[in-house]
């Protein structure tokens, strides 16, 4: 299995190691740089891994036998340490001076630090690598324990078994409705009524909103009796008696205003004297003319009249009907300039 080598021959120990590596190499051609033998043993199939493990065990036995052989043993031990350190990394190996020490402090963590309960030294497996499964399981257990201590937002779950039934809910609802109906029947026998002062306006405010829509020009001292809002039953009886007495006194005054027999007799004498001795007054002549004119207008035949804009469209707010009503109202002068009801003659 030895190949023809150009140059000085290697020592016996290195030659055997080289032959073992040649056996482990894949006979198929590879384009590009070849991976180290240890990486190939990790990425190959189970059969290759078994062969690699057997070859590594043989190399270990040979190295143990040649521990006392001088520089060869040191070189082999150094190569084995380099292979163990470089396992899991791609690319060129670091020089021996840059090798990470076993007792070196942990690398600084960038970002917020975990609570003290979450910090745990990572465990290593048989090959010297960190086992992420154990660390993740530890974190999951810690998170579960810490989650129980956190404040719970929202309704708390029931502490005991919940006994809910649709039938019982319907029965309770029917019972509440029955009680409501029975109580309503009892209350109907006693109707609730409001007092009169809550539903009726005071006498002074009966015509509220029907009066003039202007402000008062003068101060009104007679603001009205507002004691109706606070009257007791005794006050109402007292006021009712006062109103009856006031009505009686008012009726007595009306009786006094009635014309006496003397005034009536004198009025008849004056009217007979005026008819016989005096001529007809201007007021009487005016009334007679109005009556005759009204009779003529009534008997007059109505004819078709031409279109009048003011009358037909009622442009002017003061139309003919309002004009006639105003004239008719001004004719009744006797209501303003007539004699009084009592004491007609001195």
From Swiss-Prot:
Residues 60-69, 142-152 have a biased composition (Acidic residues). A motif (GPALPP motif 2) lies at residues 32-37. The keyword Cell membrane does not apply. Residues 106-115 have a biased composition (Pro residues). The modification N-acetylalanine is found at residue 2. The modification Phosphoserine is found at residues 28, 104, 136, 141, 146. Residues 123-132, 169-193, 233-267, 293-308 have a biased composition (Basic and acidic residues). A motif (GPALPP motif 4) lies at residues 111-116. A motif (GPALPP motif 3) lies at residues 91-96. Keywords: Acetylation, Isopeptide bond, Phosphoprotein, Ubl conjugation. Residues 1-283, 289-308 are annotated as: Disordered. There is a cross-link at residues 277, 314 (Glycyl lysine isopeptide (Lys-Gly) (interchain with G-Cter in SUMO2)). It comes from the Eukaryota. A motif (GPALPP motif 1) lies at residues 7-12. This is GPALPP motifs-containing protein 1. It comes from Mus musculus (Mouse).
